[in-house]
Design a protein with these regions (language model features):
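Structural helix-adjacent loops and short alpha-helical linkers that scaffold large soluble proteins
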Residues: 2-3, 51, 55
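Structural motif marking the loop-to-transmembrane transition
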Residues: 3-7, 23-32, 59, 63-66
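Flexible, glycine-rich linker and terminal segments associated
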Residues: 53-89, 102
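Small-polar-interrupted transmembrane alpha-helices in polytopic inner-membrane proteins
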Residues: 2-22, 34-38
Length: 333
């Protein structure tokens, strides 16, 4: 079960910290790899099960098996030894899975220098596992519903990446209004960003709600809000190295994610999202640190399976002493 596997993930993190590295064991690494291992491990387990159970042959089957090997090597190894009978121990049903691939050009600007861009290519995926607004009996176990976004930035001088994930631990469906649908529950969050001007990580658990309201015609309005505590997070700091030997500040805190999305006919959509993370510094240059970003994007369908979009991002960094305050902009197609 999910809860029965958590101690093994934490134990694996401890073993690596104490016996697999040359440096002294670090509490922040134990917490980060423990939380991250639980989240990423369960997501990989669920996704690989959906892939190998899919009915396809030829090149499609080869592609499914290759991706399943990438996201969950242990399942492939067990199938080689024990055969497909190990599949009977996987989750008994496969919920709907929506997978998107992204690619384009991303640019970042400094504050007060908006005309100076650093364009570079990026690729990414967006994954939604399960239906948050489906039948009442669909959500029986942790991670029966989760969302994952991963991005990779091809900057030659400073390549970057980001991961934003949240998975349902426990939830209940609600039905506000005449046709509204909602999911409220407890979610686990694993967020990480490392780009040209912005670096942070946060792991936590908290409450959240996701809603969907059909409008007239084919329009639909969606909203989500998550508030969660951060067990341990970190944010980059130019002034921490002289104090701690690290270029980031560490500490517990809190986080918030919000998004408002409106879908229109013909595959068009508009979205506005804002996330903010606050950290109380246990090790670093400032007593309190904050990191947040605002995103506005629009998309339009080109074909049934392809969309073209434009996104504007604003990154802001705050500290109580003002040492690490920063503001940057991003634009991507």
């Amino acid at each position: 079960s999910f809860w029965g596997s958590v101690p093994f993930t934490v134990f694996g993190s401890l073993v690596w910290e104490f016996f697999g590295e040359r440096e002294n064991a670090s509490l922040n690494d134990v917490i980060t790899t423990g939380f991250g291992g639980v989240a990423m491990g369960e997501m990989g387990h669920r996704l690989s099960a959906a892939l190998v159970r899919g009915r396809s042959d030829g090149a499609g089957r080869v592609a499914r098996e290759a991706v399943a090997l990438l996201v969950n090597p242990v399942l492939t190894f067990n199938r080689l030894i024990y055969g497909d009978r190990v599949l009977y121990r996987l989750p008994g049903r496969t919920p709907p899975v929506d997978l998107e691939f992204h690619s384009g050009i991303n640019g970042t600007w400094e504050r007060r220098a908006f005309t100076i861009a650093f364009p570079h290519p990026f690729i990414g995926i967006g994954l939604r596992y399960g239906d948050p607004f489906g039948a009442a009996g669909d959500l029986r176990a942790p991670y029966d519903y989760f969302r994952l976004r991963v991005g990779l930035y091809g900057d030659v001088d400073n390549p970057g990446s980001d991961v934003f994930a949240h998975g349902l631990l426990w939830g209940r469906r609600l039905y506000p209004g005449r046709e509204g649908r909602a999911l409220a529950g407890v979610f686990q969050h694993f967020d990480y960003m490392d780009n040209y001007k912005f670096k942070f990580a946060a792991n936590g658990v908290g409450g959240g709600i996701e809603t969907s309201f059909p409008l007239d015609g084919e329009r639909e309005l969606g909203f989500l809000l998550h508030l969660f505590g951060v067990a341990l997070g970190g944010v980059d700091s130019r002034y921490s190295r002289g104090l701690t030997g690290r270029d980031y500040s560490l500490g517990p805190g809190a986080g918030m994610k919000s998004e408002l999305r409106c879908s229109f006919p013909a595959g068009r959509s508009l979205a506005l999202a804002y996330s903010y993370y606050w950290f109380f510094t246990l090790s670093g240059s400032d007593r309190e640190n904050g990191a947040g970003f605002l995103s506005g994007q629009g998309e339009a369908a080109v074909t049934d399976t392809t969309r073209l979009g434009l996104e504007f991002r604003l990154y802001h960094r705050w500290s109580d002493a003002g040492f690490d305050d920063a503001l940057s902009f991003g634009l991507r197609t």
